[in-house]
């Protein structure tokens, strides 16, 4: 009976420490970082992306991360074209034949929006022509192509 009480207490403590209701992000779960799934439209398609927020040892999401998430949510329609331009430019530099968003959506697939402690945010993509490295676009505070290796 004592073991059952201990296991119940552990389960309650474990469950309460692995999720939070952030006022900006909403309900988030913790496993190495705060995360949730969310649907975003990009390149004319809807994608279910992981929203990942860095945190150390389950510490709360900070104000810089909240600020960048709020900015991205409020400005997502305006951010899509510059993101697509960055991807087009990179694809053409890699000799990929892309002419439309539909072409681009066949060779890159967004997976994760990563929010770093300093508020920088990155959109990480799977990339058909470079499976080892993939690609990322910084989407806050600036939009630019970056090397995904720095996140691994």
Predicted regions and their residues:
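Acidic, proline/glycine-rich low-complexity IDRs
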Residues: 1-40, 46, 97-152
């Amino acid at each position: 009976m004592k073991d059952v009480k201990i296991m119940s207490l552990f389960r309650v403590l474990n469950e309460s420490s692995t999720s939070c209701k952030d006022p900006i992000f909403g309900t988030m779960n913790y496993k190495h970082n705060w995360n949730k799934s969310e649907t975003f439209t990009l390149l004319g398609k809807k994608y279910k992306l992981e929203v990942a927020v860095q945190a150390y040892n389950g510490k709360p999401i900070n104000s810089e991360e909240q600020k960048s998430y709020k900015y991205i949510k409020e400005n997502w329609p305006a951010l899509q074209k510059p993101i697509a331009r960055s991807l087009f430019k990179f694809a053409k530099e890699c000799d990929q034949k892309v002419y439309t968003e539909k072409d681009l959506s066949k060779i890159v697939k967004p997976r994760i929006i990563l929010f770093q402690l300093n508020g920088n945010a990155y959109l990480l993509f799977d990339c058909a022509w470079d499976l080892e490295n993939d690609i990322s676009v910084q989407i806050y505070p600036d939009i630019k192509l970056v090397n995904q290796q720095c996140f691994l």
